[in-house]
């Protein structure tokens, strides 16, 4: 069994102390940059990298792990804390089907991406969480 050990925490643009604005492209770029820092700059092999996402970050994290798996270089594990099935599903749940589909793209279909991930997956989700439905 491979021992996984690497954890890199980052804020997405427009969240926390990070500058910039949050949009799909900036979040995807930050996710890709975080994986590159871990693997290329710090020398962490993908087979020892744990990809972690919390709340809004679970979609980009699942997409990154699916992309790595597609390239036959999956991470060691994927951990999703308070995930959602997709941003569009969340918007539909909160705003209704017509408005949700109109306003929100299907950029991070977490549930669909999980089917493509080829590493162990840990889902952490409270059964009373009314914000992030999974």
Language-model features: locations:
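Hydrophobic/aromatic beta-strand patches that form the interior of the parallel beta-sheet core
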Residues: 8, 79, 122-124
